[in-house]
Amino acid sequence: MLNIDEASALANWIQNWKKTYKENPKLNECFTWFEWKYQDRELTSSDKSSIATILRYNSEE
């Protein structure tokens, strides 16, 4: 499960991506960013579910 700081960092990254590319990142791009940012963590199925939820929430106009 993602902690508050990780979730916030991911949400900020998604918002910055949208400003730069004028589209939402793909889910796999979010996974890749998270693995790059937190190299000491292995993504669990719970993490992936949380990331998908954060992406969905931040994809709304």
Predicted feature residues:
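Short runs of predominantly hydrophobic/aromatic residues within well-ordered alpha helices
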Residues: A7-L10, L27, K48
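N-terminal acidic leader/helix
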Residues: L2-Y21
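Short, charged early-sequence alpha-helical segments and their helix-coil boundaries
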Residues: R41-E61
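Charged, low-complexity interaction regions
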Residues: K18-N28, D40-S45
